[in-house]
């Protein structure tokens, strides 16, 4: 998977949004110190570089490492100082990191949250200090102090994931068209979804199910475990270990310990896929 290429475009957009937000808030450009945007791209009024805090959820996924580095590189190329932190999928760690970014003088925050509802205190502090906040990929909910949201069309991403499963099962071509010589079924599959506290996860799942449902309805595909709702298949924090435990339980309870056929598994994330495998 070309992680950098796929997600790098969104990282570039986030860097552009950050630069634009700084300009709109009066943090960038020429200040009392006499620096101009042509000199550094982001000179603060005291002559120093403007600092941007970038909070990413984890380094256990190549995707988040690539995204964090891409945002950092884009902002540094524009002349900003960047404090990039990864939180190891631990909510208290991320809240502490964001608190520290604010204390250290960050003038804008780019946040890919672990839990989009767990940052109220940090967001309120940012709002009181007029620090713009960009929610990166994962929506931060229930707080008015989020200024921008940068993400994909996550339903369409889910459609692509569902189509990838159909293609892998030999039911469609790479463009999603039914094949005349496709297997008749029934083919056993199981479903996995992302974290229930991540707004994106439900969109991924709904998008995938929109293309899988016709095959489930006509019996070509069968979810043998019967676990077909988002709540039944969601993996908290997108964690590989949680996905592995669920897959092991499914194989034991539904597939005779692995002796019965399982044709494919829907997975929305590389880390979950590694746990499944």
Protein language model regions, located:
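Alpha-helical transmembrane segments
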Residues: 17-21
């Amino acid at each position: 998977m070309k992680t950098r290429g796929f997600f790098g475009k969104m990282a570039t957009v986030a860097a552009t949004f950050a630069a634009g937000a700084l300009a709109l808030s009066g943090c960038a450009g020429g200040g009392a110190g006499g620096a101009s945007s042509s000199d550094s791209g982001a000179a603060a009024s005291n002559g120093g570089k403007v600092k941007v805090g970038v909070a990413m959820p984890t380094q256990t996924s190549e995707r988040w490492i690539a995204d964090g580095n891409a945002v950092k590189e884009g902002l540094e190329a524009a002349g900003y100082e960047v404090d990039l932190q990864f939180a190891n999928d631990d909510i208290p760690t991320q809240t502490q990191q964001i608190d520290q970014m604010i204390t250290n003088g960050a003038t804008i925050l780019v946040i890919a949250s672990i839990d989009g509802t767990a940052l109220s205190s940090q967001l309120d502090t940012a709002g009181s200090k007029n620090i713009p906040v960009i929610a990166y990929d994962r929506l931060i909910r229930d707080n008015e102090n989020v200024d921008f949201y940068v993400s994909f069309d996550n339903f369409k991403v889910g459609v692509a994931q569902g189509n990838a499963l159909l293609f892998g099962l030999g039911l469609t071509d790479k463009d999603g068209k039914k094949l005349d010589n496709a297997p008749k079924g029934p083919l056993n599959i199981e479903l996995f979804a992302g974290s229930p506290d991540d707004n994106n996860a439900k969109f991924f799942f709904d998008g995938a199910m929109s293309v899988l449902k016709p095959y489930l309805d006509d019996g070509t595909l069968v979810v043998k475990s019967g676990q077909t709702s988002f709540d039944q298949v969601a993996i908290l924090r997108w964690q590989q270990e949680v996905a592995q435990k669920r897959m092991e339980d499914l194989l034991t309870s539904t597939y005779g310990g692995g002796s019965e056929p399982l044709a494919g598994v829907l997975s929305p994330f590389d880390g979950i896929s590694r746990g499944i495998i």
